[in-house]
Amino acid sequence: MAAKEKVAKETPLMKQYNEIKRKYPDACLLFRVGDFYETFGEDAIRASKILGITLTKRGAGSDTETALAGFPHHSINTYLPKLVKAGLRVAICDQLEDPKMTKTIVKRGVTELVTPGVSLNDEVLQSKTNNFLASVCFANKNIGISFLDVSTGEFLTAQGNAEYIDKLLQNFNPSEVLVPKNCKSEFKDAFGEDFHSFYLEDWIYKEDYALETLTKHFQTNSLKGFGVEELKEGIISAGAILYYLSETQHNRVQHITAIQRIAEDAYVWMDRFTIRNLELYHSYNPNAVTLLDVIDKTLSPMGGRLLKRWLALPLKDTNKIKGRHAVVSYLKSNPEILHNIQYQIKQISDLERLISKIAAGKVSPREIVYLKESLDAIIPIKTLALESPQEAVKVIGDSLHSCDLLREKIKTTLNQDAPVAISKGNAIATGVNEELDELRAISTSGKEFLEGIERRESERTGISSLKISFNNVFGYYIEVRNTHKDKVPEEWIRKQTLVNAERYITEELKEYETKILGAEEKIHKIESELFEQLVNWIATYIKPVQMNAYLVAQLDCLCSFTQMAVENQYVCPEIDDTFELDIKNGRHPVIEKQLPVGTPYIANDVFLDREKQQIIMITGPNMSGKSAILRQTALIVLLAQMGSFVPADSVRMGIVDKIFTRVGASDNISMGESTFMVEMNETASILNNISDRSLVLLDEIGRGTSTYDGISIAWAIAEFLHEHPSKAKTLFATHYHELNEMTESLPRIQNYNVAVKELKDTVLFVRKLVKGGSAHSFGIHVAKMAGMPQLVISKAQKLLKKLEKNHSSDALNGIKSANDEMQMSFFNLDDPLLEEIKEEILSLDINAITPVEALMKLNEIKRMLVKK
């Protein structure tokens, strides 16, 4: 009963608010009231904390008392980004009619739902970073995933196992992920809780619905033209994204012109561990420099975003890689052309996001002027590219669209100094619309206009004292003294008689009066209509502008590679069809930029092949530079296959299809996993996925457990890699100098060490990779350099001598004898039964088999052995 009374006492405004809020229960509702956006209840409490605005009460002391917090409507671009960045979905509820035109409560409705993954607001977006919305679809064997950046129109889809989808999520780093409600736990188990997720009804994730949604949007009969028709789960996830756009009131999305397949076999495989370990975009230390920080010399937002994509997806196609290298070589040899292209790229605004705003109808007059200026800057780039003898550059020049009609239309329609909002006025140029020009003349030069009429009528009638005036009763009128009454023309209409004069009105004055009183309102209306027409007309150029944006981004990335090569003395890598990796004087691209001025980076050679030196076993103490050598090898390969030059004297290499790293400590305590467990998970992932063109980098395997356990595990892993048919190229860094013994029985393992000079009381890290193993770890020396108390150092030295005396290499001999006895290699079996078991095991799909099926298979293998 009390609840009913409360409802009855709701004000009309709060009743309207509650009706709208019920439609958007999970969003923060910004409710337009007059000149303010207000929030109520729980929304107000959250908003006041996030925005730092005053929390007050509406209807204080009454039954309808509720929390209230608000801000001026013109501050929306200041406060909205803060709410979205805090992870909130924000529903913007505007007044849908002029309050002056209604006697009842103003009609209101949600005009836009802004979420972390769906926004066109410049303050929410980062210029050189895509703002992806992702959607995942779970099936029995595959997981589908799609990514959309509504601010640029990029729409991508893929499908695969959980590991592949995890890699894509790490690479694309979406701001928001859509998940079916019945798959909450599956998503959390597979990909963790780091993503901002939103759960959709399960019926949305149906193939028929997705196909209908996508074909309707693209206005096609099928999706064959996009090359995605076989990606069933990918298509379903993409359909959910388009559904979500319509739900968030983003219905004007004609800038989403295509959906592109992420071709797994076209790019180098890097799992999440590798992406993290190599510090491509993020570092363990928030203040540290990443590879992206070093290589990003792009000058446009589009170029910056594309460079991130190239870094995430290095190429495997030799011809495409060599094509990029050829452009960099050409630009490096022609510095003047490089400088001229870069100068023009600097003049180009964010074409992708500008044209997306035009499609959505959320663009300002000034932004359209920026669009025109950007297209102007493309003309000299096109000319330079067409004159180039380099074929790939010439193709870019040929493909760039000059957009002559579009540029001319904007030039003649808008003022060069157009305002940031159409409501500010003076956006449309003079000469576009006759009525607009006349209204402006009336509005800005009314006095001159009236003086002109006064002068003309005085000359026409011969009444020299004729005067035009204004009052609130008659409006504008002509006053004539009685001495000149006989000269008044017949068409003048008398309105008032005074003692010494008569007042008249004319049709012309009445028209002028009507015009001037409504001029400002009409000017705004005409300008808005003309601007809307212009925006709709420009929208027909979406595809050529998007193509221009992509081509400029490509050129920008290649110029960035060239700039980097010039500044840092990078060389062009030689790509061939061998399985070799031959680096002469390679350098770490990030570390060399962090060294003090004048300090040279110690360069190192690395050679790997499948015949003589498949595995390099690198020993040396901590701090000696082992990890840096591992990382720089991976980064050189990565840069080469991105199409960049590389930090070395020379590099010759066959294509690498997968890069695996297990580098440095990376506890996942939040997931309840220790260092050792994380290490074993990462290493297992590597061993289960290697190929004949893989590059494997292992650092300090086994250090998270006891010494003997660690040595045993490291030994077994190294032998597995050596004996595996793929013979994957491997760098294996360890401080277990016992592993140097492996070269005696495994011919493709070669020992190297990072040179250290032992001085009187300290060690000098030379950081040079030299052939041969290292017999000492120098751990106590490192502890001393770190400032450990002398008492601790002395005690450690005594204990070390005692341990070295008491513990010979018995443990190592035990490992070697076990090796001889058990034939640790599982790939050299002569027994037909064991060969059969080997085939059984190798044919198993670990990712697809259930625990019960695994036990049944194990029981089957046991029966085979018992029979024997």
Swiss-Prot record:
Family listed: Belongs to the DNA mismatch repair MutS family.
Function statement: This protein is involved in the repair of mismatches in DNA. It is possible that it carries out the mismatch recognition step. This protein has a weak ATPase activity.
Keyword DNA damage: yes
Superkingdom of the organism of origin: Bacteria
A Pfam family this chain is assigned to: MutS_III
InterPro entries in the record: DNA_mismatch_repair_MutS, DNA_mismatch_repair_MutS-lik_N, DNA_mismatch_repair_MutS/MSH, DNA_mismatch_repair_MutS_C, DNA_mismatch_repair_MutS_clamp, DNA_mismatch_repair_MutS_core, DNA_mismatch_repair_MutS_N, DNA_mismatch_repair_MutS_sf
GO molecular function, one term: ATP-dependent DNA damage sensor activity
Keyword Secreted: no
Binding sites annotated in the UniProt record for ATP: G620, P621, N622, M623, S624, G625, K626, S627
GO biological process: mismatch repair
Protein name (record): DNA mismatch repair protein MutS
Keywords recorded for this protein, A-Z: ATP-binding, DNA damage, DNA repair, DNA-binding, Nucleotide-binding
Annotated GO CC locations: cytosol
